[in-house]
Amino acid sequence: MNILRRGRLGSNVKEDVMKFTTSLEFDKEIFESDILCDIAHTTMLVEQNVISEENGKKIIAELKKIAKRGMENLDLDPSLDDIHMVIESELIKELGEDVAGRMHTGRSRNDEVATDLRLSLRKKVLEIIGHLITMEKNMLTVSDAHKETLTVGYTHLQQAQPVTFGHQILSHVSAIERDISRFFDTYNRINISPLGCGAMATTGFNLNRKRTKDLLGFYGIIENSMDGVSSRDFIVETMANISMLGTNLSKICEELVVFSSAEFNTIEIANEYTSTSSIMPQKKNPDVAEITRAKLSTLNGELVTVLTIMKALPNTYNRDLQEISPHLWKSVYTLIDSIQMVDGMISTVKVNKERMKENAEKNYSTATELADTLVRECGIAFRMAHGIVGELVKRSIEEKVEIKEIISEVLEKNNLSLSQEKIDTALDPFENVKLRNVIGGPAPEEVERAISSFNEKISAHKDKLDEKISEIKTAEKNLLE
């Protein structure tokens, strides 16, 4: 029976209502966190002389036993609503209500669940960062191997300018760097304690909120009790980060799908990430990239769902907030799985260097450098050079001739001239790449410098990650031993 109902509401509750309102199905994500929260709160109650040391020791010892048993071995009676009441009921079975019933002194499930969510989510955020660091390192390995692999870059999915495949990979590394920074920033806002806020107005008991903050390894406390129990912006922020990262990863999936097609044929996805057709024996379909792309798209929907649940809720706690959790955890696991899939596909991709080079040498990808050369060598305005090269491209297409066959004629018409060496250099795709040696450019030397810079950032990220993981492990060890 739900021990909460025997007073105000009575023991009768409809079974379909119990099943409809229980959160036990997804409370598995906060089970361990709830035990930690209980131990920290009980420890503080003893230190503040709110409950006796004897009772506190009994409660904590039993909580540790429950933790070792695991949630799956508890009586998950849906009439108990949630994991908080399941654990308290287990305590009461073993210790009696006069002892176990003291654990919840000065606390509400409102501040309890808010604390649990933060404890669980901070670990998941660090797990995500760890996967991103691994993927980024692997991508840098691919980039380094292809810093001189000529290919063509696209705008509007139309061939634009020559780059290297290594430079193209770095474009995704650069985006992931920002994703990592966002998650680290969000971690600091997750890792603050609402414990002690009570239902919404704190408590008349002499609690020490700073002590539970320290015991649980939080960086600080939420100082307004109403905000402490009702705020879920840390979840929205995390899910927004997840959605943004998902969008960045979906671009990689799109490139894997498009560039592995026969029409592009610049890369080949490893067999283990593809499938064949049930009817067409020749097919090699990029199924994993496609499914990952689709799963990543659902992250946007999960974010919007949570925002919609939260919109215009009255202050402070409302049971609506319970329905946020399944969307949060689904997003987290979808993202982690997707990161691993993208990492695997990028790490094992086969590159068709000849096809990449062939693409870079056609369709006028060197036109911009030819215009730039006219500006540098002839001293004309770029807009004039742009028009001259545009005319060259137009005539080349219409007359089905190479630019180098008509360039002297067009330049002479405009009272300009270029040496054959300058023309050849301007029209050479790899010379184009080497010329672009500014910060962020595709020149092999610059790509090599960028790889080194990103590796330094990864090292700093890893140190920061290890430090935060160590902080959490220390707090958990101190509470559970």
Curated annotation (Swiss-Prot):
It comes from the Archaea. Its EC number is 4.3.2.1. InterPro entries: Arg_succ_lyase_C (IPR029419), Argininosuccinate_lyase (IPR009049), Fumarase/histidase_N (IPR024083), Fumarate_lyase_fam (IPR000362), Fumarate_lyase_N (IPR022761), L-Aspartase-like (IPR008948). GO terms for cellular component: cytosol. SUPFAM superfamilies: L-aspartase-like. It catalyses: 2-(N(omega)-L-arginino)succinate = fumarate + L-arginine. This is Argininosuccinate lyase. The gene is argH.
